[in-house]
Amino acid sequence: MTVKILVVDDDEALAEMVGIVMSTEGYKSVFCHHGEQAFNVFQESQPDLVLLDVMLPGKDGVEICRQIRTVSDLPIIMLTAKSDTADVVAGLEAGADDYIPKPFKPKELVARIKARLRGRSSEGQEEDVDMGDLRINVVAHEVFRGSERIDLTPLEFDLLLTLARSPWKAFSREELLEEIWGYRHPNTDTRLVNVHVQRLRAKIEEDPEHPKIVRTVRGVGYRAGGNCA
């Protein structure tokens, strides 16, 4: 089945270039150039992944990202001409999985897309992994606390499972970027990891300000806390 990519960008020349790149990879592209129309186009097109510009006429990409996240956990990659911390963090906190600054090389965009589309979490033989008082059903991609199901995005699930599968190992942010996002080059922005850990903690920790399940290792990164099996 052909992968469908929704490209939301008011720069029509850039969108056309992205469409050509997507076509060479065998992906189908759907385009939207105005923020006010983006959510309707999303609902009508039912894409597998969204490329979403931050700066759009009518409604900005951060607000659109929040709208999409109310109904879907599909991968969202923000496109931004700004490297400003506030814009990057706002997009990630709104629910974006990744971001790529303009201008970008086509091969870098393709690599980011493939990393987000790649199903990694169900690799391996185990069906359930325990992490603190959480039970992770690997095959079903579900997380439970007792009988309560905790809704995570696929990326949040991957992050939690990666930590749970290597109990007591302290992962550097760079290691997590390679493991979860597929980045294999130096000088990558580690804010991606920090923001997604915050989002994950908000969902799984009973007290996110004093986390017990995903712990910070000062000067290193993050590790699983509690009993993991």
Language-model segments: which ranges?
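Residue-level signal for the "D+5" position in two-component response regulator receiver
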Residues: 31, 56-59, 85, 93
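Active-site beta3 strand of CheY-like receiver
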Residues: 45-51, 56
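Acidic catalytic/metal-coordinating carboxylates
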Residues: 34-37, 60-63
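Short hydrophobic/Thr-rich beta-strand motif most characteristic of the beta2 strand and flanking loop
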Residues: 26-34, 41
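His-Asp phosphorelay/catalytic-motif detector in bacterial-type signaling
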Residues: 46-48, 71-76, 186-187
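Positively charged, aromatic-enriched patches within helix-turn-helix-type DNA-binding elements
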Residues: 142, 147-154, 158-212, 218-220
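Charged docking surfaces used in two-component/phosphorelay signaling
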Residues: 16-24
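Basic, amphipathic DNA-recognition helix from helix-turn-helix-like DNA-binding domains
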Residues: 66, 70, 75-130, 202
